[in-house]
Design a protein with these regions (language model features):
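Flexible, compositionally biased loop and terminal segments
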Residues: 4-190
Length: 190
């Protein structure tokens, strides 16, 4: 049974069916495919997926979070070295309070569960994004996850939380403007 948006599960099932459960690296060799060094996924559309099935948007978010585990197994089996999941963007704060609260609840659970799974699978986990706006328990869970997995040597798994392209560009431009401003002040004061 497919729990959420089906992409990686279908790939896994097809490989198992076609090659009797051989690892994906063998599958790639047979097809002559080059494995990418880094795969990044934006978790988008889970709410719409649920709505199409006449379920609440939050159901889609829960199911989408479970699919991340399937994706981790697929990219690891393929031999991908770096996997990034964009889990919560800065733009997600604009959603309803109930939806944001649900996303934070899912995130809390995921971060705690991720420690044991990552240790078992030798995955090194890092979280990128802005800490502001995140609760202290989530920040503590992030620190715990990164600290416990820092010496793992397998797949490098990055979770982007409170991260957004527009926000990153805005902060970069502001930083450059601040540097220019400081340089002008230094030049004018001489």
């Amino acid at each position: 049974m497919i729990r959420g948006p089906p992409g990686p599960r279908i790939v896994t099932y097809c490989v198992t069916y076609w090659y009797g459960g051989e690892h994906l690296d063998t599958f790639n060799e047979k097809l002559g495919l080059r494995v990418p060094g880094h795969v990044a996924v934006i978790l988008d559309g889970n709410g719409r997926w649920a709505k199409k099935r006449l379920m609440p948007r939050t159901y889609g978010h829960y199911q989408g979070s479970k699919v991340v585990e399937d994706m981790l197994h697929v990219v690891d089996d393929m031999g991908v070295k770096y996997f990034t999941v964009y889990a919560f963007s800065t733009e997600n704060w604009n959603r309803s309070k109930d939806e944001v609260d649900t996303l934070m609840k899912i995130l809390r659970t995921y971060l705690v569960d991720c420690v044991a799974k990552s240790m078992k699978n030798n995955e090194r986990c890092r979280v990128i994004g802005r800490p502001d706006g995140l609760s202290q328990d989530i920040l503590d869970s992030i620190h715990n996850l990164e600290e416990k997995t820092k010496n793992n040597t397998g797949l490098n798994f990055t979770i982007a939380i409170n991260y957004g392209g527009r926000d990153e560009i805005r902060r970069a431009v502001k930083s450059i403007a601040d540097e220019v401003k400081l340089s002008r002040m230094t030049l004018l004061s001489r």
